[in-house]
């Protein structure tokens, strides 16, 4: 089967997800091409004639609107943000009558997307060959526990509630330390630097605010616990499980997961404390292999594609 993906060539979680899908589609023996929607040019795989199915991750070139090829649209973002940014939900609805079906990754969002179009839900996976425990990590981040926040920050996606939660974590574990990475926006950095000084956050284990790193898996391996403040869903922070680290995230509600919490500083603090107290009893890597293997995500996607492929 020849699968053509349309996605913006950029450095983002969405792009990493798409590249993982392509890698494992090829492993199943399929030909994969990834194209930039703005110019319809391939930047991954080999240009060729036609496709058996086209998969939209952000936009679709207008010249493909009426080519009669089967089409899927993958819903990477969560519905509330798609409405909140003033653009995405309208674009999704406008394209809905050009596609055969939607794909989503989390059962909580299925009822919303399925109102617009027939929607299939597949498990959200990560590349477990990339996100994995590393032997011989000697430069662990100081702290017991060393807590990491590395999610891309924008708008309401930020670590404010985690910073507040650190007061309670620090009372329980005075050696606890919080590290904030991947802060790219200068206004966001200025805001949190000022907030940190005003609240004297250094006194409750907040170490500082750093920019992005090249090796995310190495950073994950240097930490003990990873925290995301996303709600009501979750995103790429499940990479933590692949690296063998527990994840604290208000939007992560997988059945059977011990360390769930609400979007509330006290609840986040409680989940961090529980995760550290039970640290040696939870196998995060095994959880990732069971629940978040992108190879299984792709296997299920391909089964669906084959029902519609030309």
Question: For each predicted feature, which ranges?
Answer:
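Acidic anion/phosphate-binding donor-loop and adjacent secondary structure
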Residues: 83-84, 125-140
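Conserved donor-binding/catalytic core segment of Leloir-type glycosyltransferases
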Residues: 139-157, 163-166, 179
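Acidic donor-binding loop of glycosyltransferase active sites
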Residues: 221-232, 245-246
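A charged, aromatic-enriched C-terminal amphipathic alpha-helix characteristic of glycosyltransferases
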Residues: 13, 262-263, 276-310
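Glycosyltransferase donor-sugar binding loop
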Residues: 36-38, 177-193
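A short, active-site helix/loop in glycosyltransferases that binds the activated sugar's phosphate group
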Residues: 93-121, 126-130
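Nucleotide-activated donor-binding/catalytic signature segment of Leloir-type glycosyltransferases, i.e.
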Residues: 192-211
């Amino acid at each position: 089967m020849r699968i053509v993906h349309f996605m913006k060539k950029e450095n983002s979680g969405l792009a990493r997800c798409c590249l993982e899908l392509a890698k494992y589609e090829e492993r199943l023996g399929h030909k994969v091409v990834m194209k930039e929607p703005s110019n319809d040019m391939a930047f991954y795989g080999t240009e060729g004639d036609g496709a058996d199915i086209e998969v939209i991750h952000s936009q679709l070139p207008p010249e493909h609107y009426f080519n009669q090829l089967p089409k899927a649209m993958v819903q990477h973002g969560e519905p509330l943000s798609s409405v909140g940014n003033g653009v995405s939900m309208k674009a999704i609805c406008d394209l809905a009558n050009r596609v055969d079906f939607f794909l989503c990754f989390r059962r909580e969002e299925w009822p919303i997307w399925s109102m617009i179009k027939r929607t299939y839900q597949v498990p959200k996976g990560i590349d477990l060959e990339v996100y994995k425990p590393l032997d011989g990590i000697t430069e662990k981040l100081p702290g017991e526990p060393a807590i990491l926040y590395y999610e891309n920050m924008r708008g309401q996606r930020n670590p404010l509630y985690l910073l507040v939660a650190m007061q309670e974590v620090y009372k329980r574990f005075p050696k606890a330390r919080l590290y904030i990475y991947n802060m790219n926006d200068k206004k966001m950095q200025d805001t949190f630097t000022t907030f940190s000084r005003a609240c004297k956050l250094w006194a409750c284990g907040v170490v500082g605010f750093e920019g992005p790193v090249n090796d995310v898996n190495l950073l994950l391996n240097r930490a003990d616990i990873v925290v995301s403040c996303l709600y009501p869903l979750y995103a790429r922070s499940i990479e933590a499980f692949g690296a063998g680290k527990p994840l604290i995230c208000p939007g992560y509600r997988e059945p059977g997961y011990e360390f769930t919490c609400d979007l509330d500083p006290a609840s986040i603090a409680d989940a961090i404390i529980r995760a550290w107290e039970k640290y040696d009893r939870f196998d995060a890597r095994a959880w990732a292999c069971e629940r978040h293997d992108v190879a299984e995500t792709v296997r299920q996607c391909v089964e669906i594609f084959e029902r519609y492929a030309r």
